[in-house]
Swiss-Prot record:
The keyword Iron does not apply. GO terms for molecular function: asparaginase activity; beta-aspartyl-peptidase activity. This is Isoaspartyl peptidase/L-asparaginase 1. It comes from Arabidopsis thaliana (Mouse-ear cress). The record marks G182, T183 as: Cleavage.
Amino acid sequence: MVGWAIALHGGAGDIPIDLPDERRIPRESALRHCLDLGISALKSGKPPLDVAELVVRELENHPDFNAGKGSVLTAQGTVEMEASIMDGKTKRCGAVSGLTTVVNPISLARLVMEKTPHIYLAFDAAEAFARAHGVETVDSSHFITPENIARLKQAKEFNRVQLDYTVPSPKVPDNCGDSQIGTVGCVAVDSAGNLASATSTGGYVNKMVGRIGDTPVIGAGTYANHLCAISATGKGEDIIRGTVARDVAALMEYKGLSLTEAAAYVVDQSVPRGSCGLVAVSANGEVTMPFNTTGMFRACASEDGYSEIAIWPNN
């Protein structure tokens, strides 16, 4: 075994290269903080499942990412959050969607995995399950910020479902690349080759109430097995159609591709250009973070000393 490794993301999309410093720096700082948190946890011997949950919780608590506190609004001005988590060794997994009051959806997804015979709970039943297990909840107004109200207003004015960090067009007001559609995720592997993946999001601005994206769909936005762990981000419908996360693992399992080869093939060939990015680690400590969008907020580190925090290609 090569050793531990970790990778995380804060969303992929059309992130303009001239993203203002006041939008860029807080996100880069958050990625650095979360990466350091994950590294410390892995070095202290925490299982990858704990590490992935810990990092995603921290990302959910950061208002500049579209998950937890920063979740964007539906067409009706409400929040509907979703998340999933998976353990590679056992293939146990949990997923939730339609959450309106849960502070950390990723932790509720883990409770579904550990406390029920099921994989997926949604909407009122998931909220009731959260209350029954003492999960931290708040009034839904906690998530409805002035910034997200403004984003929804803009999306409605132009009759669109707002996609990831959309580059403004001449008919669309300049949003500084801050459409706040960044799914968050983390994958981790320890020195024994144990793997885990976790992903969380608020979805699209102006999405239909009840819409479910790729994030809570095991095999689409999240997957882990004995070979690798993957967390995807981007346009959910395309990621679901491409079964992105599972396809990376399948190419490794059935075709013998390396993690980097498998992930690159899926991102380049299985989904439309401009629709997807992912972070992934393998059981031997390999890390890859490909994307076919303008940029992806991402960070990684491995036991051999390599680390990276980046947004655009080659930066």
